[in-house]
C-alpha cells in the first residue's frame, strides 16, 4: 500500500475529530509527490527555505517519481493541512516552547497513520537547543519508545542508494557538516516514523536563485554534498511506501547502483 493511500484511509476519522469535513483531506487530488516544512513555532522554523525545492529537483531528475515542486518556504501548521502531507521536514537552530497536548496528540496520530517526519538540525552540533527541544517533544509523542540509532542494515540506507554496507563502508549519512555518522529515530515496529539528523542536510541542499550553493560543506566539499543529496533521496523513497520488504526494496535500482562512486 502506498503511504498516500494509507494516510487517506487512516485520517478521515481524525478530521472528524477535528470537526473538519472529509473533503478537507486533499491527499489524492494530485498524484505528484511533494514535501513541506513543519511550522512548529512562530519563529525559527524556516532556517533553510530553498533546500526542499532543490532536493525534489534531484529526486525528479534521478528517479521515476513525479514531483510537485513546493515554493521556497512552503509549510504546514498544526491542523488539517498536516494530514495532506505524507512527509514533512522540521529544521531549526534555536529552542522553542513546548507544544500543547492537542498538538502532541495530532503529531502522534499523523505519524501512526503513516506520516514520516525528518528532523534536521541546522545547528552543527549534536545537542544544541533545537535538538533538545525536539527531543523533549518526541519523548512526549513516543513515551514508550526511546530514541535510538537506526541500524546500518535498515532499509532507509538502501531504499535507492546503498549506504553503510561492506562494499561502500565510507558512504554514511552526511550533510553540511559531519556531526553524527548515524541517523537516529523513533520506531513503530520496523517502521521509522521520525528520523533525526544532526548534520544539516538541508544546508547542503540549499541553493539560491542564481544557482549558487548557500553554504560550504565541511570537511568533504562536493563529494559530501552529493552524499547528502543521496541520503535525502533515500528518505523520500522510504516515505513513498508504508512498509518495505528489506530484501526486495527497489531491486532494479539497487542492482544498477551497486558500483556507484562519489566523484
Stretches with model-predicted labels:
Residues 1-14:
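N-terminal secretory signal peptides and thylakoid transit peptides that target proteins
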Residues 21-23:
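N-terminal signal peptide c-region/cleavage motif recognized by signal peptidases
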Residues 25-87, 94, 201-202, 209, ...:
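Aromatic-Pro/Gly-enriched surface loop or interdomain linker
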Residues 32, 43, 124-229, 233, ...:
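An acidic, glycine-rich "communication" segment
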Residues 35, 87-131:
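Short alpha-beta junction capping motif
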Residues 49-56, 104, 108, 131, ...:
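Extracytoplasmic/secreted envelope proteins and their assembly/folding machinery
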Residues 71-77, 100-106, 179-181:
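Alpha-helical scaffolding within the catalytic cores
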Residues 82-92, 160-169:
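Charged, often glycine-rich, active-site loop that binds/positions anionic groups
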Amino acid at each position: 500500500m502506498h503511504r498516500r493511500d494509507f494516510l487517506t484511509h487512516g485520517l478521515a476519522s481524525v478530521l472528524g475529530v477535528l470537526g473538519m469535513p472529509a473533503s478537507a483531506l486533499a491527499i489524492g487530488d494530485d498524484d505528484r509527490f511533494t514535501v513541506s516544512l513543519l511550522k512548529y513555532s512562530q519563529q525559527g522554523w524556516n532556517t533553510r527555505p530553498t533546500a526542499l525545492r532543490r532536493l525534489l529537483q534531484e529526486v525528479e531528475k534521478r528517479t521515476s517519481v513525479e514531483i510537485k515542486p513546493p515554493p521556497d518556504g512552503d509549510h504546514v501548521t498544526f491542523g488539517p493541512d498536516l494530514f495532506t502531507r505524507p512527509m514533512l521536514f522540521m529544521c531549526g537552530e534555536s529552542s522553542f516552547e513546548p507544544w500543547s497536548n492537542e498538538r502532541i496528540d495530532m503529531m502522534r496520530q499523523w505519524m501512526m497513520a503513516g506520516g514520516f517526519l525528518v528532523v534536521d538540525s541546522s545547528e552543527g552540533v549534536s545537542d544544541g537547543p533545537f535538538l533538545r527541544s525536539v527531543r523533549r517533544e518526541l519523548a512526549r509523542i513516543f513515551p514508550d519508545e526511546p530514541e535510538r540509532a537506526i541500524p546500518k542494515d535498515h532499509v532507509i540506507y538502501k531504499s535507492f542508494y546503498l549506504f553503510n554496507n561492506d562494499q561502500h563502508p565510507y558512504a554514511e549519512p552526511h550533510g553540511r557538516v559531519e556531526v553524527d555518522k548515524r541517523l537516529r529515530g523513533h520506531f513503530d515496529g520496523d517502521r521509522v516514523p521520525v528520523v533525526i539528523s544532526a548534520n544539516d542536510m538541508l544546508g547542503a541542499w540549499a541553493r539560491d536563485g542564481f544557482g549558487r550553493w548557500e553554504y560550504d560543506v565541511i570537511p568533504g566539499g562536493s563529494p559530501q554534498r552529493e552524499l547528502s543529496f543521496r541520503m535525502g533521496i533515500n528518505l523520500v523513497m522510504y516515505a513513498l511506501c508504508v512498509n518495505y520488504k528489506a530484501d526486495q526494496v527497489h531491486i532494479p535500482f539497487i542492482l544498477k547502483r551497486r558500483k556507484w562512486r562519489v566523484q
